[in-house]
């Protein structure tokens, strides 16, 4: 069973579930770009530890503090375990879930960019093998010295020199890594050997990588492999604890995440301005305002607050490596409310609630009974994903749950719009109000197209963009999502603004006799020079 320091939900009573969800929210603030992953009883052959976009002079530090293989000493000496560091394409992380069980990544001779860290438990050393063009990718033993906490204090010296002969270790105390360099025929460093410590039936070592030039910049994926667990049914559980610290010259954020602080701050201001403008419209047209209009205002302000907290979180992650706990909790709460309000508002507008009717049908109530719990589940999945490490055993499961639930919600909110369109189509041919119903029908058809475009741009086009652009431009994915959301909000407000000439306010209130009398009076010229009075859905007259 794999466990992480950032736990999710488990079994228990509803009260315990609530407590654990709150615990997840609180611990979510601890996640950042300094990662600590602890797995016990793990049986996976390949563990995707993390991915990160590095610029020149960026650094990756890895400290394997615990590795217990759970086998006899003779069996451990023949194991094939280690790390791999590869440069992957933008928008994706290498997956080993479908590979052949006889194909071990640690035994590959690759012409592409790849670094292998082969753990040799027999000789107590870690052999580093490089493949591809890596002229300025520097690998050193130990961790980088920490910066002084106060100005004027001297920096602590590294406890391990970068190149030292020897590789033996002592089991009496925790020894330092002692690397050795083997020279190749050309005189260049071909294989770097790091010292491996063995203490209390556990192995440990550390290293750090520095990106030396622009040629080595890119999206890197760090993975752990235990090739002896590749054969199904013959897995042996092992324990591993690893610390990963990633940093770019300007902070702890990945290359694609650096612009997000400013992006989310600007978008938060845009949604705030849109919300204030919308409230001003409602205050000027109080006679035509429905409850759904105030719900739309609440959604705009909630979205703005959510983006504000998200922006602040990224600022502290970039400067400290982790966000502030209180702000992280506030962000998760705002995000949960925003997600629920968004789909509820879209579904209510699509059903025509308060616009063309005051009571939801049984079918529409069932849709809300599906969308609301699904949105709660989607937000719980999002919080768990944000608060757990990529290497956690259930990380991929929660990502799949989030994708599936979000897809179901996007499909479900279209049904009320379709039903409203059909209702107006049927009504236009039966109640004699063809002109009014056709105007409403056109309005809801436009809204249907808007919802389709919103889902298409934020779910499909955004993913394609993320795959297509280089690693440093991955933030365009968030720009497209937030920009599409803002455009959808503005267009929805424009289409359903509380003005007297809006089609949804022109609800027919007259019966058939009134229509006939109106026709007679018009034909006779009796009403010449008089203006027509329409009644709104609220029963109030608009001149």
Curated annotation (Swiss-Prot):
Protein name according to UniProt: Protein GPR108
Lineage of the organism: Eukaryota, Metazoa, Chordata, Craniata, Vertebrata
Region (Disordered): 149-186
Keyword Acyltransferase attached: no
Domain of life from the UniProt record: Eukaryota
UniProt-listed GO biological process terms: defense response to virus; negative regulation of toll-like receptor signaling pathway; regulation of immune response; type I interferon-mediated signaling pathway
Membrane topology: Multi-pass membrane protein
Alphabetical UniProt keywords: Glycoprotein, Golgi apparatus, Host-virus interaction, Membrane, Signal, Transmembrane, Transmembrane helix
Membrane-spanning segments: 263-283, 292-312, 336-356, 367-387, 401-421, 449-469, 473-493
Signal peptide: 1-32
Gene responsible for this protein: GPR108
Domain comment quoted from the record: (Microbial infection) N- and C-terminal domains are required for AAV transduction.
Family to which this protein belongs: Belongs to the LU7TM family.
Pfam families, sorted: GOST_TM
């Amino acid at each position: 069973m794999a466990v992480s320091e950032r736990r999710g939900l488990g079994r228990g009573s509803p009260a315990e579930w609530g407590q654990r969800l709150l615990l997840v929210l609180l611990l979510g603030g601890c996640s950042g770009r300094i990662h600590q992953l602890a797995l016990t009883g793990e049986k996976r052959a390949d563990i995707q530890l993390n991915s990160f976009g590095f610029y020149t002079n960026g650094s990756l530090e890895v400290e394997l503090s615990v590795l217990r293989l759970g086998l006899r000493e003779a069996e451990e000496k023949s194991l094939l375990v280690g790390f791999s560091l590869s440069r992957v394409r933008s928008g994706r992380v290498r997956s080993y879930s479908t590979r052949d069980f006889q194909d071990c990544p640690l035994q590959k001779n690759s012409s592409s960019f790849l670094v292998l860290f082969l753990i040799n438990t027999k000789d107590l050393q870690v052999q580093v093998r490089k493949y591809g063009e890596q002229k300025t990718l520097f690998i050193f033993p130990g961790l980088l010295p920490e910066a002084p906490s106060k100005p004027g204090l001297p920096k602590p010296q590294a406890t391990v020199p970068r190149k030292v002969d020897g590789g033996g270790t002592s089991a009496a105390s925790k020894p330092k890594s002692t690397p050795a360099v083997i020279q190749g025929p050309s005189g260049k460093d071909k294989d770097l050997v790091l010292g491996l410590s063995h203490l209390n039936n556990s192995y440990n070592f550390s290293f750090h990588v520095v990106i030396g030039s622009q040629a080595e910049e890119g999206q890197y994926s760090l993975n752990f492999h235990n090739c002896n667990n590749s054969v199904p049914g013959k897995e042996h559980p092992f324990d591993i604890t690893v610390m990963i610290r990633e940093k770019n010259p300007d902070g702890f954020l990945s290359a694609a995440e650096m612009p997000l602080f400013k992006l989310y701050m600007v978008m938060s201001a845009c949604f705030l301005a849109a919300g204030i403008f919308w409230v001003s419209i409602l205050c000027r047209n109080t006679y035509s305002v429905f409850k759904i209009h105030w719900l739309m205002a609440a959604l705009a302000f909630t979205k703005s607050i959510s983006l504000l907290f998200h922006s602040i979180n990224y600022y502290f992650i970039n400067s400290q490596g982790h966000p502030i706990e209180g702000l992280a909790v506030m962000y998760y709460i705002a995000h949960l409310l925003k997600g629920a309000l968004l789909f509820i508002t879209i579904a209510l507008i699509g059903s025509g609630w308060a616009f063309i009717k005051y009571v939801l049908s049984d079918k529409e109530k069932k849709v809300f009974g599906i969308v609301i719990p699904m949105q709660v589940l989607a937000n719980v999945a999002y919080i768990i994903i944000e608060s757990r490490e990529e290497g956690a055993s259930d990380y991929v499961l929660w990502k799949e749950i989030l994708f599936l639930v979000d897809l179901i919600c996007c499909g479900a909110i279209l049904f009320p719009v379709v039903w409203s369109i059909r209702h107006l189509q049927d009504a236009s041919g039966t109640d004699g109000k063809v002109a009014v119903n056709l105007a409403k029908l056109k309005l809801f058809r436009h809204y249907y197209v808007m919802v389709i475009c919103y889902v298409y741009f934020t779910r499909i086009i955004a993913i394609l963009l993320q795959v297509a652009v280089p690693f440093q431009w991955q933030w365009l994915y968030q720009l497209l999502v937030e920009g599409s959301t803002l455009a959808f909000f503005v267009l929805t407000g424009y289409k359903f603004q509380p003005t007297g000439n809006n089609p949804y306010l022109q609800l027919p209130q007259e019966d058939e006799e009134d229509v006939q009398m109106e026709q007679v009076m018009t034909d006779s010229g009796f009403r010449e020079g008089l203006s027509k009075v329409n009644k709104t859905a609220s029963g109030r007259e608009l001149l």
